[in-house]
Design a protein with these regions (language model features):
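Periplasmic-binding protein-like
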Residues: 31, 109-116, 180, 184-225, ...
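Short helix-initiation/N-cap motifs at beta->coil->alpha
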Residues: 51, 67-77, 122, 156-170
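A ligand-binding cleft/hinge motif common to bilobed small-molecule-binding domains
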Residues: 74, 89-99, 146-149, 174-205
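Sec/Tat signal peptide C-region and signal peptidase I cleavage site
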Residues: 15-21
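Extracytoplasmic small-molecule ligand-binding "clamshell" domains
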Residues: 22-91, 99, 234
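A conserved helix-loop-strand patch within extracytoplasmic ligand-binding domains
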Residues: 63, 91-93, 105-155
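Ligand-binding cleft/hinge of the Venus flytrap
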Residues: 37-40, 54-61, 127, 140-161, ...
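Extended ligand-binding regions for polar small-molecule ligands
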Residues: 51-60, 118-121, 128, 133-134, ...
Length: 249
């Protein structure tokens, strides 16, 4: 399936990049993963670090970015089937995913860290302390993959990290592995203040994010990579990063 659609009044599609009308870029994203992608409850708009990145890429490359909200484990199948053109959703580059889709160069190393209750925190000094434990995870996440490799663990999966945090807070599991920036950001939010959770500082493993496209779509892949390179070179990437993570310590 073609990866771009040019909107025309008669509904006719064209691949001409030189045309006046913007090309629609259908971007799949899990929009409940602040601060990377989420829905602003005040105006209903999709916001976050990834959303700012892809919209800036769209501005530079002439795309009309259309965000399509979906589950994390639905992103790769949607790319394979051609229902979306790109996946931009704090998506970890893994060998399993790379067999089915193509990734840009990594644009962020989030790093997996441990979220647990304040009572359990002193008991966890390394990954070994998670062995033979009941753990929580977001379904389809890199954290879930890593936890399943820890000897003796049972991993309960949830539709979102927020749901997993709630279960962890209730004592439904011992701990969870999740992207470090998300753990830290969550603990700065009002919703977490009445919860008994804390994030540990040590990084369990690297967690490199990439934007994904349908296998073999070299044209779009190059445009995304080129735009990210340009944004790093001119300081735009750093400005967007500081906007979302500058106050997250």
């Amino acid at each position: 399936m073609a990866m771009f659609k040019k909107i025309a009044a008669a509904g006719v599609f064209s691949f001409s990049a030189a045309a006046d009308a913007a090309q629609t870029l259908r971007v799949g994203s899990l929009t409940v993963y602040a601060p990377f992608e989420y829905v602003n409850s005040q105006n209903g708009e999709y916001e976050g670090f990834d959303m700012d990145l892809i919209r800036e890429i769209g501005r530079r490359k002439g795309f009309d970015v259309q965000i399509i909200s979906m589950t994390l484990d639905g992103l790769v199948p949607a790319l394979v089937s051609g229902n979306i053109d790109a996946a931009v959703s704090a998506l970890t580059i893994t060998p399993e995913r790379a067999e089915k889709v193509d990734f840009t160069k990594p644009y962020l190393n989030a790093g997996l860290t441990v979220m647990t209750t304040k009572e359990n925190a002193p008991k966890i000094k390394s990954v070994k302390d998670l062995e033979n434990k009941l753990l929580c995870a977001e379904i389809g996440s890199s954290g879930a993959l890593v936890m399943k490799r820890i000897p003796g663990t049972t991993v309960r999966t949830f539709n979102s990290a927020a749901d997993a945090f709630l279960e962890l807070n209730k004592g439904g599991c011992f701990a969870m592995l999740n992207d470090g920036p998300v753990n830290k950001y969550f603990l700065t939010q009002k919703a977490s203040k009445s919860m008994n959770l804390t994030a540990l500082d040590f990084v369990v493993s690297d967690d490199f994010y990439g934007m994904a496209v349908q296998k073999g779509n070299k044209k779009l892949l190059k445009e995304l990579d080129d735009a990210l390179d340009e944004m790093r070179a001119d300081g735009t990437f750093q400005k967007i990063y500081d906007k979302w993570f500058g106050d997250v310590k």
